[in-house]
Amino acid sequence: MDLVDPSQSAAAAAGTQTVKDEVSEKCQKLFQDFLEEFRGSDGELKYQSDAEELIRPERNTLLVSFIDLEQFNQQLATTIQEEFYRVYPYLCRAVKAFARDHGNVPQNKEFYVAFQDLPTRHKIRELTTPRIGSLLRISGQVVRTHPVHPELVSGTFLCLDCQTLVRDVEQQFKYTQPSICRNPVCANRRRFMLDTNKSRFVDFQKVRIQETQAELPRGSIPRSVEVILRAEAVESCQAGDRCDFTGSLIVVPDISQLATPGVRAETSARVGGTEGYQAEGVQGLRALGVRDLSYKLVFLACYVCPTNPRFGGKDLHEEDMTAESIKNQMSVKEWEKVFEMSQDKNLYHNLCTSLFPTVHGNDEVKRGILLMLFGGVPKTTMEGTSLRGDINVCIVGDPSTAKSQFLKHVEEFSPRAVYTSGKASSAAGLTAAVVKDEESHEFVIEAGALMLADNGVCCIDEFDKMDTKDQVAIHEAMEQQTISITKAGVKATLNARTSILAAANPVGGRYDRAKSLKQNINLSAPIMSRFDLFFILVDECNEVTDYAIARRIVDLHSRIEESIDRVYTLDEVRRYLLFARQFKPKISKESEDFIVEQYKRLRQRDGTGVTKSAWRITVRQLESMIRLSEGMARMHCSDEVQPKHVKEAFRLLNKSIIRVETPDVNLDQEDEHEAEEEPQEVINGDASVPSGVNGHVNGMNGHAEEPNAATPKPSLRLNFAEYKRISNLLVLQLRKMEDEDETSQRKSELINWYLKEIESEIDSEEELVTRKQIIDKVVHRLVHYDQILIELTQTGLKGTGDEEVPKEEDPYLVVNPNYILED
């Protein structure tokens, strides 16, 4: 071999003896026999075709299955596993000899071997010194990647004294010169020059991986380790990927520690004191090796593969995917299952139940999240403007309505998902941070949650608890799907093509149906408009629903396996999802007209003010409808968006808007509360009758003073839009009177003014009585429930209580100074 001979001849010339590693050489011979002789299940020589591939200039690594090696020779497999770092160079020589036998490869080309299918997987925190040098498989999430650069692995040095070439000086992960010139008559130990043309370099990349949450012991913080990738393994993983790394644990000098300024620790045998022998020995042991013994553990990986591969084989980049390439990656059985799923008439429902088997109800939310996973089609206009295809979903709801469960399910299911909490996330943690590299001392970009979830889903819990300045940081990522950074001398625009699934709690803990959506959640208008779907989950008391949910929870606790009913397994859903996402459905003319028609309906209804409790309908909602329609078409593996897909998209969008519409206002609600709190007054027949209109109410409902007659009395309800209209009229009138006359109006005066305003609408005396009753109760609600109006009573001494009673029945009314009139 040209690798060994020069050093051996030089060693022989120098009069030194080279020690042969018999175990490694035997492994080399047996491993070459394995490559030559091993046959696959089809009877063909398995690795011969792979060796022929190595002729290509970009290929230099032969991938070997460890299971095949165990079948061929168990003892060889055990030796390689235990002594991997020792025998690795000899295995590479065996691959080189094998490649030369089966192909016309260049003489000076280096080859490497990589192992896959190792039976056991180790955790990062199990990487301790006893495992150094053995073949291991570890898994973790990539959190930082460094750029690829050339690494000197074997140097050729020129002696500056005698011009002798010293070849194949192995570099121990730092610049290493020969210890002495190999010319026997030259004693040079320092003056060497590297000959870069005759030295060997290899691609080198450093990545940092971190423990995943599933592997984390209780009460521990995630450990991280640096992984060194070489040759073909470089650029095989990106920040955010969860990967398996096969290789060995090694010890390398800590360059950053060696580079720190400090005095080199030296040992000396000094003689001092009254008696010389007392002070003999090494002095300064405390400082010994402070610089020299700075080493750290790193993982040298020869093979990288995704932890949860989309199929049994290689992972595919989303840009390179076609139906044919995906089909080729699947087995016949897997492809038949995908085809069977695409023909399923009830696919929509079955996918929802398979994804969220432990969550009862909330079918609309499940459908929205399912369409988010399929996504729309990203587009680029002629001007170069990008239109996002990812769908953003926000779930707003009361506590204990399974919001976080949805987020956790998506994080576990999606191959590329990041889960984070809003309160514990900063702007840099969500987007990207600029940090200083320990070794090069240059500024590098460290990926945040949105970058880690590129081409995936970012789940943000407690979205409403985020600080405003941190919410602003994700404006750009949610619409333009990029992150722009200009700090610390680094200017970059990064991709964040991610769907955002957010969960938020309403203000005050409970969703108030009497208020609009934007009043219920602590989010700015720009953020709200960037969400395609809003789902409101209200914890309502319903005997049937409560029983079903309780039964489901108890079933899950008692019979976990039996109660989870999945139509498809998660792997089947993942496979189908990836296959369906490569479709790029186009909108047909019929669907286009239908989308425009539905958008007009939404806009007109928004203009009438009926849905003031929903957010504003803008062009973004039109784009949302298009994305949802494309997601529906993708789910059914259709190349064209059909009207039925638009119909379902409109229904979902409409549902998320209508869902927040307020029910009719119960004007008798306060009377019912009073009846519960003051049972004595109900018996007397006074509590259920509002003050000021006793005569009319008694005239309308018969004998209201009888307790039995009051019980079946139907509650008086008013449409919410009508209620808001009346309240706005009253507020405007009171403010007008305050501005003009600087005086307040009494309650009776305000009621009379309102009745006079609607005089043309009243046809009979009965209707007048009803309208008076309604306006009286509206004023009562505005004062005591909504606190929009304030009653001003005449102040006086406690002893004059009898004189104040008639004035309190007709108090002055003013508008609460903190109240802002809605448009």
From Swiss-Prot:
- Primary subcellular site in the record, as a coarse category: nucleus
Q: Is Cytoplasm among this UniProt entry's keywords?
A: no
Locate the compositionally biased regions of type Low complexity: 692-702
Q: What domain of life does the native source organism fall in?
A: Eukaryota
> What Gene Ontology molecular function terms does this protein carry?
ATP binding; ATP hydrolysis activity; DNA binding; DNA helicase activity; zinc ion binding
EC number(s)?
3.6.4.12
Residues bound to ATP: G397, D398, P399, S400, T401, A402, K403, S404
Q: Which UniProt keywords apply?
A: ATP-binding, Cell cycle, DNA replication, DNA-binding, Helicase, Hydrolase, Metal-binding, Nucleotide-binding, Nucleus, Zinc, Zinc-finger
Describe its function: Acts as a component of the mcm2-7 complex (mcm complex) which is the putative replicative helicase essential for 'once per cell cycle' DNA replication initiation and elongation in eukaryotic cells. The active ATPase sites in the mcm2-7 ring are formed through the interaction surfaces of two neighboring subunits such that a critical structure of a conserved arginine finger motif is provided in trans relative to the ATP-binding site of the Walker A box of the adjacent subunit. The six ATPase active sites, however, are likely to contribute differentially to the complex helicase activity.
PANTHER family listed in its UniProt record:
DNA REPLICATION LICENSING FACTOR MCM FAMILY MEMBER, DNA REPLICATION LICENSING FACTOR MCM6
UniProt protein name: Zygotic DNA replication licensing factor mcm6
- Species of the source: Xenopus tropicalis
Gene coding for it: zmcm6
